[in-house]
Amino acid sequence: MKKVLFLLTALLLVLTACSTARQKLSPQGNVNLKTADVYYSQENVDQAEIYYLKVLEDNPDHVIALRRLGDISLFKAEYFTAREVEFYEDAFEYYSKAISVTENFPELTNQDRIDLRDMRKRKERAWARIYMAAEKEKEAGNTQKAKEIFELAHKLEPDRPEPMIQLKNIYLVDIKDEVKAEQILKQLLQKDPDKLEYLLEMGTFYYNKGNYAEAVKYFDHARVQNPTNVDNLMNISACYYELKDYEKAMIATKTALEIEPNNLDLLENARSIADQMNDLDQSIEYLKRILDIRPNEDTYSILAAHLMQKQDWQQLIKYAEEWYNWDTTNKIAVEYIIWAAQQSGNRLLATKYSEIKNKMP
């Protein structure tokens, strides 16, 4: 941590000299700045903080003092963990102001740009640590404390979706207040109606409540923002499936399969939808595709039943034999082969598998 805090100490004189033309200080202000720099270089953060604050009294926009106070606040947050959120908030505020002041300099130098990159990284770090502190409190079961810290994280970065989504979850899961959870999501969407994360959250909220017609509106809107999001296409399909609009459910699933043709969840969904549509041919095709990727007894069993229903004896023989070769102890597969062979007039094959069946336990 000392390295983080004092890495730039050697540059203090250079930075101070560069800033004087832009950021005037009174004679006493200059004395306070030099005194603060000395204490800072000696790693006496408490005294350095006192004198950097005095510099800000003389010039509230003094970038060097703001940056150093941000660094000191980061240092304190890591060493005084009981007050880490307080110190990370201070660091965030100091860096925010220093960044704002620097960005408004009449002409940015290369050093200014380097400083801005560094300050933005540190500001982001401070915010991330606040968010992580809230997550820790939530995991520990300290709901109220977590709520307060997530609210702070949202106040500091109102455009970041994560804190408000976490607050929604707290109200929904921990506090059991669906009305407040819905209110939070509506507020977020009112502010940014096209934000993908908010649309997905709102759709999920209504889906979990069983309001599939409302849920699909938000998932469809999210699809406009990201047409190739497979998870969202599955959401849309699931909504239409629950609404018994199987044609639309199949359209969404097929679109997703164009993106991920070997996605087993999608193939299973497509097969299930085809069954609901009484479309035996489509169901059979999806079952075959599933078996090409992951042979399993349930899929073989369903496919065999479908092929038997269609009286497609040659295909039934093919897949029942494949089933038997995959599991030579499976008597049902053998019986399907025998039946299909008999129906298709293949006596030799029927005899062969009848003998195999007779030898089975």
Where are these regions (language model features)?
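N-terminal leader/linker segments that initiate helical-solenoid repeat arrays
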Residues: 2, 18-114, 122-128, 132, ...
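Residue-level recognition of tetratricopeptide repeat
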Residues: 37, 71, 78, 135, ...
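Structural marker of alpha-solenoid helical repeat scaffolds
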Residues: 58, 101, 105-108, 156, ...
